Regions:
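Bacterial N-terminal signal peptides that target proteins for export
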Residues: 1-8
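Secretory pathway targeting signatures of secreted, lumenal, and periplasmic proteins
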Residues: 22, 39-41, 179-246, 251-254
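Solvent-exposed alpha-helical segments and adjacent loops
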Residues: 26-40, 95-162
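N-terminal "mature-domain start" segment
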Residues: 29-31, 39, 43-46, 55, ...
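Signature of long, low-cysteine stretches enriched in small and polar/charged residues
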Residues: 69-128, 235-302
């Protein structure tokens, strides 16, 4: 089963890159990002199989300062899967039948609309399908995440913010694909800040470089210190206020505070290793904050560390989709000096 799923996931990644087009005779997809239509018999949905599906896909997103699920789920019985729903961006068809010889999932792309993914998950018994989800549920969910990521990346390639992309290329020697709407807010030799402003929210990112002095330069402590140095160039709403990294949170056991350190892991994207940090930003001297994710790697051509740091401010609204679309930026980054 694990071998099947690994082959399946690789195939999904390859096919999804090729299948997400933005000019076709097919109709456009409907639905919001990170929304999945699950077509499943009511009896299955109300039982342990439906419970397992909901637990997997509605797992809370980590490292955002409110509870939001990984995906928003719309359940439809097969008889109601009509009208506009076959054009939805993300569809999971759940089929339990004694005629199924194996428990498996397979993906199809652009079946009715594009860029669309339709996954059929089938098995001979409820028990077999629940066991499959317990073992492979996160990988199954990852297939839909890859599809959402590819839509963002390919959309930015097709309808990019060309002027800002060229500015970044000249300044940092990297190619990046940005959806239109971002405005450059500040820039100097080693720093660039851009944001996309909404009436009640903001998506922003800043890129910065600094010298690499060995492994001590990429410890979490060193990366946070560098982040604070450059984030201080992003002003807050009141005079003298500026962005910084949250470093303490209330202690639930008493009235004091405890140290908070961003989560860290190394990820490999497009052949390049990046140190990913996830945490929260706040404003020194004012009351603002939200989640951030940063990616740092070594530019071997310059022997400097380069960081793409993404943040969201949405005090009254959801943050998941805003942050996810920023995370997808890293998948469109390549170094012009390393080609």
């Amino acid at each position: 089963m694990k071998r099947f799923l690994s082959i399946f996931i690789v195939a999904v990644a390859l096919v999804s890159l090729a299948s997400c087009k933005f000019s076709s005779a097919k109709k456009s997809i409907i639905g919001a990002p990170y929304e999945v239509v699950m077509v499943c018999d009511d009896e299955l949905w109300d039982g342990p199989l439906g419970t397992e599906l909901r637990e997997e896909f509605q797992t809370p997103v980590e490292m955002i300062n409110q509870e939001e699920p990984m995906f928003d789920v719309i359940h439809l019985a097969p008889r109601n899967f009509t009208s506009i729903y076959p054009s939805h961006r993300n569809i999971l068809k759940v089929v339990c039948s004694p005629n199924a010889t194996t428990t498996a999932a397979h993906a199809e792309y652009d079946v009715v609309a594009e860029p669309q993914i339709v996954v059929t998950f089938q098995g001979p018994t409820v028990e077999a399908m629940v066991d499959y989800l317990k073992e492979n549920g996160k990988s199954l969910m990852r297939v839909f995440e890859i599809a959402e990521r590819d839509r963002t990346v390919n959309g930015a390639k097709a309808y990019g913010a060309t002027d800002l992309e060229n500015d970044i290329k000249r300044q940092f020697g990297i190619e990046i694909h940005l959806l239109r709407g971002y405005t450059k807010r500040n820039a100097n030799q080693d720093f660039l800040w851009a944001s996309l402003e909404y009436p009640v929210a903001s998506q922003g990112f800043f890129i910065y470089t600094h010298p690499f002095a060995g492994k001590e330069s990429i410890t979490t402590e060193a990366l946070v210190k560098a982040r604070n140095q450059f984030a201080s160039r992003i002003p807050g709403p009141s005079e003298g206020s500026y962005m910084t990294t949250l470093d303490k949170i209330p202690n639930i056991d008493n009235d004091g505070y405890v140290e908070f350190v961003p989560e860290r892991k190394v990820v490999r994207i497009n052949g390049c290793d990046w140190v990913e940090l996830r945490g929260f930003w706040e404003v020194e001297g004012d009351f603002m904050g939200g989640p951030f994710v940063s990616y740092t790697t070594l530019d071997k051509a310059t022997n400097k560390l380069i960081t793409l740091d993404c943040y969201v401010f949405s005090p009254k609204g959801d943050k998941r989709n805003l942050l996810r679309s920023l995370e997808h930026l890293i998948y469109g980054v390549s170094f012009t000096t390393q080609k």
